């Protein structure tokens, strides 16, 4: 049986660093991230939709705006995390080094299930563009 999929695109601006990166990405820096948020369902609603796009906007895009937009995202094991948090409450952490791959993973494995728990959809894949030339994806494997 197939699945229906819809994609909502959303852009935020935030900073990060890749702890122990071998070149300049080890430094604090920022991106204009573009997220491609793919939601899936085996069934359509009574109007023939996976879900109204406004629901994705109200839940997932709002979460991104509230939690990551104009914030500094660091790995919770990064020595800079606790030091920067003392200076600025806009520093947030995730349980992995905040590469594009891991940010996508965090959304699919942690945020999506929390936000969509009562809905008949799954956040099945996130593609994250760091630049117009570089992107990374994470998807639920079937």
Which residue stretches match the model-derived regions?
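Charge-rich, low-complexity N-terminal segments
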Residues: 1-142
């Amino acid at each position: 049986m197939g699945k229906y999929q819809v994609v909502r695109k959303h852009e935020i601006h935030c900073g990060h660093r890749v702890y122990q990166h071998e070149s300049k990405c080890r430094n604090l820096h920022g991106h204009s991230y573009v997220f491609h948020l793919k939601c899936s369902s085996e069934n359509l609603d009574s109007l023939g939709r996976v879900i109204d796009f406004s629901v994705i906007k109200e839940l997932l895009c709002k979460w991104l705006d509230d939690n990551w937009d104009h914030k500094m995202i660091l790995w919770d094991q990064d020595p800079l995390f606790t030091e920067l948090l003392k200076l600025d409450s806009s520093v947030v952490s995730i349980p992995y080094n905040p590469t594009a791959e891991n940010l996508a993973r965090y959304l699919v494995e942690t945020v999506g299930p929390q936000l969509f728990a009562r809905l008949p959809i799954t956040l099945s894949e996130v593609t994250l563009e760091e630049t117009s030339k570089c992107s990374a994806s994470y998807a639920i494997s079937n």
